[in-house]
Amino acid sequence: MNNDVFPNKFKAALAAKQVQIGCWSALSNPISTEVLGLAGFDWLVLDGEHAPNDISTFIPQLMALKGSASAPVVRVPTNEPVIIKRLLDIGFYNFLIPFVETKEEAEQAVASTRYPPEGIRGVSVSHRTNMFGTVADYFAQSNKNITILVQIESQQGVDNVDAIAATEGVDGIFVGPSDLAAALGHLGNASHPDVQKAIQHIFNRASAHGKPSGILAPVEADARRYLEWGATFVAVGSDLGVFRSATQKLADTFKK
């Protein structure tokens, strides 16, 4: 049986430096995720760090995206091999790893997604991703079809951006603007010049190592500026933000 995740088109698009416009999925609901999957985004982040998601909520969302052209990307709650292994087994193959500060942490993230001898991923012969054992070449194809995006959101991460970006197996560098702003002493103000300078520096250093860079930018002017700075995978909003804004606008139209 063929596995429709191979080849990984999102990974290939990143490697080719093709602009990929994405959206955040934070409502943890398969219907809202299915609607996002119909909108035409290149990729969607299913958030396991700041949204109320777990294995039981991720599976129906992956099912809802089965016919979508939007690539599902999971942001794991933490860079931990067992968590990553379980997410691999339920159907994810694109990973966003939060709060990576060193080359060693980047290497651990990569190793967690690779079968031995390249990594430490535990082996199950039957799970959702290999269609419960019916994909004959899954083991041969898996390692080279996993996407690892590491998130830089601290001063230490900025200081080590060159080593992180140069790590074999890291496919892209993602900036966490809110946590980065907090780490630089500007909590709640990612627009501060110091934060913007750090973001542009991260983009530049990622590019110097041949790696694409990305960011979450729900404000259009910010998203367009980051694209001009060279970011290629940009999430331009979230389901939660769009829902809140639209419902507030609708209520205001009739209540004011």
Swiss-Prot record:
GO terms for molecular function: 2-dehydro-3-deoxyglucarate aldolase activity; magnesium ion binding. One of its GO terms (cellular component) is cytoplasm. The record marks 75 as: Transition state stabilizer. The record marks 89 as: Increases basicity of active site His. Substrate binds at residues 151, 178-179. Its EC number is 4.1.2.20. Keywords: Lyase, Magnesium, Metal-binding. InterPro entries: Aldolase/citrate-lyase_domain, GarL, HpcH-HpaI_aldolase, Pyrv/PenolPyrv_kinase-like_dom, Pyrv_kinase-like_dom_sf. It catalyses: 5-dehydro-4-deoxy-D-glucarate = 2-hydroxy-3-oxopropanoate + pyruvate; 2-dehydro-3-deoxy-D-glucarate = 2-hydroxy-3-oxopropanoate + pyruvate. The active site is at 50 (proton acceptor). It holds the Pfam family HpcH_HpaI. Homohexamer; trimer of dimers. Catalyzes the reversible retro-aldol cleavage of both 5-keto-4-deoxy-D-glucarate and 2-keto-3-deoxy-D-glucarate to pyruvate and tartronic semialdehyde. This is 5-keto-4-deoxy-D-glucarate aldolase. It comes from Shigella sonnei (strain Ss046).
